[in-house]
Amino acid sequence: MEAGEEPLLLAELKPGRPHQFDWKSSCETWSVAFSPDGSWFAWSQGHCIVKLIPWPLEEQFIPKGFEAKSRSSKNETKGRGSPKEKTLDCGQIVWGLAFSPWPSPPSRKLWARHHPQVPDVSCLVLATGLNDGQIKIWEVQTGLLLLNLSGHQDVVRDLSFTPSGSLILVSASRDKTLRIWDLNKHGKQIQVLSGHLQWVYCCSISPDCSMLCSAAGEKSVFLWSMRSYTLIRKLEGHQSSVVSCDFSPDSALLVTASYDTNVIMWDPYTGERLRSLHHTQVDPAMDDSDVHISSLRSVCFSPEGLYLATVADDRLLRIWALELKTPIAFAPMTNGLCCTFFPHGGVIATGTRDGHVQFWTAPRVLSSLKHLCRKALRSFLTTYQVLALPIPKKMKEFLTYRTF
């Protein structure tokens, strides 16, 4: 998909359950996730089941004519030893999913010491957040249950691993807390973060591992230090529950999505509100009096940091370019709940209320040299450090995303 083209549906996966279970309570796909290296896809398909699917998809899932676009050269090397699809029975409704990065060498040694039954080559894990407050940790290659983390008193709504490979996990719950877990120490709970007054819907760790964002039902967005586990600041601006959040790949931007129909783009270092993306009605057949038609469900950054994808209750997947205030593309979808980009770009996965997963084409563009330089600099410079540089004002505005 080139920039400006409409997303095309590549494939749709439907749960293999009896039809009488469709549209029943607990059939929703609340979360979908790709592993950081793009080799696995996880799908909470409802009724306590998570599917682990090797990526790219096998041929039977891909419509004719799309093979070349959705399959990679990795597929040509698949043989008898290739990974197989796994079915995880979690025993409870699954709300949150998160893959760990491949653990760093020190974490691998600790993991091997505490889990000698798990070979070092099988260190990719999946965390599942459950309806009863439990978190289950699964070994991806084998589908074995490794750990069961207890502590939350209500639904675990979202999960996020530190991108560094340290196997630190953050969980967000309806019990109004976030909890920090160290999987290197048998899943020991190392911190409880309190302060939200209502359900915590989502959490996200910045790619540089310095900040944690959490958002809740009281319109609030909290930013925490991942070093001291203390509150840095609160971000005010939404008029309803904030249900989704994501950092840009260089950690320089934060986006939050709310039931108030807006996505807000923030500078997480200063707390400044940079821009709002309003989800206006585009279907004239829809009733203006329905205040919930554009309530947002999910927002995520593209891997190169130039685009956003959003899912809303008005039956649309939208794709936005950061420099524009209106979407560059739409795709019709029904009952969307979540979305995520493939880590290497080109594909967006969406989950729906009826338990389905859809894969869409996403923009593929060659990033400009200017953007690549900005992304590289902002990966290790805070906004305050950029503003302190002896460079022209226009360059500072570009590097801090005030201009594009």
UniProtKB/Swiss-Prot annotation:
GO terms for cellular component: cytosol. CDD domains: SOCS_WSB_SWIP, WD40. May be a substrate-recognition component of a SCF-like ECS (Elongin-Cullin-SOCS-box protein) E3 ubiquitin ligase complex which mediates the ubiquitination and subsequent proteasomal degradation of target proteins. Pathway: Protein modification; protein ubiquitination. Keywords: Repeat, Ubl conjugation pathway, WD repeat. Coiled coil: none annotated. This is WD repeat and SOCS box-containing protein 2. Residues 356-404 form the SOCS box domain. InterPro entries: G-protein_beta_WD-40_rep, SOCS_box, SOCS_box-like_dom_sf, WD40/YVTN_repeat-like_dom_sf, WD40_repeat_CS, WD40_repeat_dom_sf, WD40_rpt, WSB_SOCS-box_domain. Gene3D superfamilies: SOCS box, YVTN repeat-like/Quinoprotein amine dehydrogenase. Residues 68-87 are annotated as: Disordered. Disulfide bonds: none annotated. The keyword Repeat applies. It comes from Homo sapiens. WD repeats lie at residues 16-55, 81-140, 144-183, 188-226, 230-268, 283-322, 325-362. PROSITE patterns: SOCS (PS50225), WD_REPEATS_1 (PS00678), WD_REPEATS_2 (PS50082), WD_REPEATS_REGION (PS50294). GO terms for biological process: intracellular signal transduction; protein polyubiquitination. The SOCS box domain mediates the interaction with the Elongin BC complex, an adapter module in different E3 ubiquitin ligase complexes.
